[in-house]
């Protein structure tokens, strides 16, 4: 290429060039009012957008989680349900954001929070709001200035912050700088939201609790179930369940899919045609330990909410450099499971990632390899708060561990997982590790009663956690006390009816711990978790309680009910409220029968 390729070259000389350069207006061509942003994406609706939904679009949306914005805009504009389903939560959330300053949408993987957020954004665009989405990767040095410029330029503004708990510095700045008509639409996975929301609203008060509305999107409402049935009918996605009648399909969504989009998607993956392809992937994965660990690293990092999975990060987890080889990444299993671009490595489907992990053919092989990956990433950490330690903490937490381990023999796999992590020297001195280990042993008690032997281990782990915690200045032990309360409820359930006094004493210990935690003054909804197991204890011993025990039990339930009545509503609070109310009602009913015989 030569300079003449760009046009005619005129010899003007150096002096002429210098004079012309001095006279150039560097502001020419720029609109001083133009907003230049790099940390946010301005969401806009293209005019005359007409696109028809194809079957391939539906499959790509459901299995790969890839949203076509033009089709989504059509849905909002035309009020249709061809591409996505207009859900009850969406309408409730939209109304609440119009009335309040902040809306938080939270839900687990593949349950529709991103689509719901986009639909709400498009609706508000049509009502005159300017909508800005925070990019996954932004410059902290300039993002605050961009927020200020946006707020100066536009009166009605909505900021969408995905994974908001990891971006609280930006959220806090918007909250402090906001105008009268500034709104925030925040999204998060359920685990992160529940972990931090109490601190954000009640302890640090980074958002106004009276102006912040929380909407869980995990569950499909009763009114929307039939919409989902019609949607699956229209696109022939029922597979071998196509012959089900309406009631059978409703029961499938409610029970098998747990009234969740996530459950419906897993059901689609279980169809014979898709399942046979996945079985081939399993065989290729277990055929090579190197392939298995690299694939597992990418899948686990995706599920643990890492936005940018780089080759270096995968290499750090596997302690292997194979991922840098293009020939290694060109293997068929990578092509089928992983997308690669300049930002890093991404599973083609989050729901497929979870399905592969949940249904792994050999749980022991998976657990052993996950332990190796966790040990590797832990060994790379040089600070309590560096990226490697944050990844390790995520993967080693009970909430994530139960999602990345096979559903077959889940509790046994969890226990084996924490037994493996116990070999890390630092973890044996960490109270939080022993707490997670205890939670693993307490897990899934609703499916079967925990054995007395298992509960002995639970007590040992909790005693270790509490002892280590007390040696650390200002260590907050409420989480340990919460699991102690849960332990006492589970222990009470193991006694025979003839040992009702021992069972009742353990119940009182659980009650006293719950009251102690509440009096500590740090608001946390986790306090209600042990309460959700009271019903099984009551059902077992209700016919053998002494009169004074019934009186005390009723008083305990009333005291706790009074406490949690002031808690913001969520699924666990509602469940605890219902259980306590039913116990009180049953005690009063039985007393009424006795007194009127």
Per-region residue spans from a language model:
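Winged-helix-like regulatory helical subdomains adjacent to P-loop NTPase cores
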Residues: 33-89, 109, 263-325
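Walker A/P-loop nucleotide-binding motif
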Residues: 99-117
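Post-Walker A helix-loop "phosphate-sensing" segment adjacent to the P-loop in P-loop NTPases
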Residues: 122-132
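C-terminal leucine-rich, beta-strand-based interaction scaffolds used for sensing/assembly
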Residues: 304-482
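Alpha-helical repeat scaffolds
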Residues: 370-374, 409-424, 451-470, 498-518, ...
């Amino acid at each position: 290429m030569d300079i003449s390729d760009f046009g005619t070259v005129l010899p003007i000389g150096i002096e002429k060039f210098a004079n012309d350069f001095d006279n150039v207006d560097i502001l020419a061509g720029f609109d001083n009012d133009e907003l230049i942003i790099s940390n946010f994406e301005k969401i806009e609706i293209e005019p005359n957008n007409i696109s028809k939904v194809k079957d391939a679009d539906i499959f790509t949306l459901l299995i790969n989680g890839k949203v076509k914005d033009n089709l989504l805009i059509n849905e909002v504009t035309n009020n249709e349900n061809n591409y996505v389903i207009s859900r009850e939560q969406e309408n409730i959330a939209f109304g609440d954001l119009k009335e309040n300053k902040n809306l938080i949408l939270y839900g687990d993987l593949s349950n529709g929070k991103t689509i719901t957020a986009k639909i709400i954004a498009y609706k508000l665009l049509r009502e005159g709001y300017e909508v800005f989405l925070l990019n996954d990767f932004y410059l902290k040095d300039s993002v605050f200035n961009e927020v200020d410029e946006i707020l100066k330029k536009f009166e009605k503004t909505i900021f969408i912050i995905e994974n908001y708990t990891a971006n609280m510095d930006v959220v806090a700045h918007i909250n402090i700088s906001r105008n009268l008509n500034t709104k925030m639409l925040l999204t998060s996975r359920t685990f992160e939201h529940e972990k931090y929301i109490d601190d954000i609203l009640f302890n640090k008060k980074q958002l106004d609790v009276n102006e912040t509305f929380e909407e869980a999107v995990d569950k499909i409402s009763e009114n929307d179930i039939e919409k989902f049935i019609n949607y699956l009918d229209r696109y022939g996605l029922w597979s071998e369940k196509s012959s089900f009648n309406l009631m059978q399909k409703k029961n499938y969504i409610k029970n098998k899919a747990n009234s969740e989009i996530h459950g419906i998607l897993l059901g689609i993956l279980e169809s014979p045609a898709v399942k046979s392809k996945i079985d081939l992937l399993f065989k290729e994965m277990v055929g090579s330990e190197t392939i298995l660990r690299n694939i597992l690293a990418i899948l686990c990092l995706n599920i643990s909410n890492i936005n940018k999975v780089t080759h270096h990060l995968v290499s750090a987890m596997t302690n292997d450099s194979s991922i840098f080889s293009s020939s290694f990444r060109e293997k068929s299993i990578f092509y089928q499971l992983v997308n690669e671009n300049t930002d890093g490595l991404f599973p083609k489907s989050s729901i497929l990632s979870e399905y592969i992990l949940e249904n792994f053919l050999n749980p022991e092989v998976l657990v052993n390899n996950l332990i190796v990956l966790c040990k590797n990433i832990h060994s790379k950490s040089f600070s309590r708060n560096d990226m490697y330690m944050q990844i390790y903490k995520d993967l080693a937490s009970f909430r994530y561990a139960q999602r990345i381990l096979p559903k077959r023999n889940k509790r046994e796999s969890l226990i084996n997982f924490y037994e493996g992590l116990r070999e890390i020297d630092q973890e044996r001195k960490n109270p939080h590790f022993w707490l997670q280990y205890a939670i693993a042993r307490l897990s899934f008690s609703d499916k079967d009663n925990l054995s007395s032997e298992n509960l002995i281990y639970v007590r040992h782990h909790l005693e270790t956690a509490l002892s280590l915690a007390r040696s650390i200045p200002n260590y907050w032990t409420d989480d340990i006390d919460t699991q102690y309360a849960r332990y006492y409820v589970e222990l009470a359930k193991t006694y025979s009816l003839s040992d009702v006094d021992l069972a009742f004493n353990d119940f009182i210990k659980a009650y006293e711990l719950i009251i102690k935690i509440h009096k500590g003054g740090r608001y946390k909804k986790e306090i209600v978790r042990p309460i959700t197991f009271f019903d099984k204890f009551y059902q077992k011993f209700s016919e053998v309680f002494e009169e004074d025990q019934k009186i005390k039990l009723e008083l305990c339930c009333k005291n706790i009910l009074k406490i949690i009545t002031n808690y913001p509503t969520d699924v666990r609070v509602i469940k605890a409220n219902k259980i306590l109310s039913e116990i009180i009602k049953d005690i009063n009913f039985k007393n009424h029968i006795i007194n009127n015989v």
